[in-house]
């Protein structure tokens, strides 16, 4: 979830269904226009909004850092997300349980684990490159 609009839409649908929906908030740590996610400075107002809801529970953060060949830069981005994760957990928001930090994909999952990820997405490393010609 990367916006207040989406968060409130999920709240509305979860209320209709009579459930509490677990979500992750997505952070666009590199400020890339090609990626979704809230800018890091917008995470706090998004958490404030989430904490005021009755049918949403924030379970953590997710992020995809910019693709680059600079291992040190990649780790800096991942470390920044980890610091946001820790700070969000320390703030004691209602309905916020920072348990999951989803960052790292096939190309950088080792760095992500070193920097605190609890969930990595490594489909390409397991299954290989996608063949888009078969559509």
What do the PLM-derived regions correspond to, one by one?
Residues 1-107, 115, 129:
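Conserved alpha/beta-domain cores
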Residues 110:
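Conserved active-site alpha-helix within GNAT-family acetyltransferase domains
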Residues 113-135:
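C-terminal helical cap(s) of enzyme catalytic domains, especially alpha/beta-barrels
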